[in-house]
A protein has these predicted regions:
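Phosphate/nucleotide-binding beta-alpha loop and adjacent structural elements of enzyme active sites
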Residues: 1-332
Length: 332
């Protein structure tokens, strides 16, 4: 049984090697480092992380195994200036918004949000940083800043037109006082020509009176049916540029090849196949040979995953080349 992205590390690096410039992936709120899956792009990517914790960035820079991976000790928001950073029991829960103490009281899982003081930090915007650093256009933007994701997006409006996909932590309940919620983020991104593609890692918080063994705090796409799920509280949202999911959208083969890498890194199999097919059809010579080879390999991996019921019923425009003999996933 095959698991993982349908375009593996070898395939990713082969396709990325055809691009006119490396994939540029940015992680805002990068404590503990950029996602490991980004590193599978190898020399085909430049990876930049941002975090307000200068000590953490120094540690990550010292541990980086490639000069194409670096960390900036910068707090990003929607303006230049200073802001209050609210510290919490768990350093990963620090935010530019104060913890919602009512939520902490109701949900024992949020004890990590207990206030532990404040510090003043300098802030800037992603757009201002990109301009001053002469940064390449951003292809993948990941934001996990504990309720301040919309602030970062508002400070990135000049950068967003180049972005092909975003991965954001979103809250469905106010875990921080005054924070924007999922609906606010969704409206903003739709206004900027992105569509919601997938929700992942949905976290549900139980109430104070729930028994410990009935409190669900899952990582994955669903709450186990045998458990009390509690209230949906937060998760990760994957957004893609609207044209990525449009089988009738025409774009240069270089753009489609870039989209294939982006979709594969985010483990979006149907978009990976669609982009590979478009890229292969749009070029000739050695690039076409490489793309056709990786498309064939990706189809085989997709077919195996579908046979084992791991992820999807192929959409209509992909179904014809995924494999006519594959059985649809059984309900149940």
């Amino acid at each position: 049984m095959i698991s993982g992205p349908i375009l593996d590390a070898r395939g990713l690096q082969a396709v990325a090697g055809l691009l006119e410039r490396p994939i540029h992936a940015v992680d805002v709120g990068c404590r503990e480092g950029v996602p490991e899956r980004w590193r599978t792009l190898g020399a085909g990517a430049t990876l930049v992380g941002f975090d307000a914790d200068s000590d953490e960035c120094a540690r990550l820079n010292a541990a980086a195994i490639s000069t194409q991976e670096r960390y900036e000790p910068i707090a990003l928001s929607d303006s230049e200036g200073t802001a209050t950073l609210y510290l919490t029991a768990d350093p990963q829960s620090a935010s530019l918004y104060p913890p919602n103490l009512d939520a902490v009281r109701r949900h024992p899982e949020l004890a990590r949000h207990e206030p532990h003081g404040t510090v003043t930090v300098a802030t800037t915007t992603l757009d201002r940083w990109a301009e001053s650093a002469h940064a390449a256009p951003i292809d993948i933007l990941k934001i996990d800043v504990q309720g301040a994701e919309l602030n970062v997006l508002r400070g990135a409006q000049a950068s967003l037109p180049a972005v092909r996909a975003l991965e954001l932590e979103v809250e469905f309940q106010p875990l921080y006082a005054g924070q924007p919620l999922f609906a606010d983020v969704d409206i903003f991104l739709r206004e900027h020509d992105f569509v919601l593609w997938r929700l992942r890692d949905l976290a549900h918080c139980g109430l104070t009176h729930s028994r410990r063994d009935e409190r669900a705090f899952p990582v994955g796409d669903a709450v186990e049916k045998t458990r009390i799920g509690g209230q949906i509280s937060w998760g990760n949202a994957i957004y893609v540029r609207a044209e990525l999911g449009d089988p009738d959208s025409a774009r240069p083969w270089q753009t489609s090849a870039r989209d294939a890498c982006v979709a594969a890194v985010l483990d979006l199999p149907e978009l990976t196949l669609l982009a590979l097919e478009r890229a292969a059809a749009g070029t000739s010579g050695e690039p076409r040979r490489i793309l056709a080879r990786e498309l064939q390999r990706a189809r085989a991996r997709a077919n195996s995953r579908r046979l084992h019921g791991l992820f999807w019923e192929a959409p209509r425009h992909v179904r014809g080349f995924v494999g006519a003999r594959a059985r649809p996933r059984q309900a149940g």
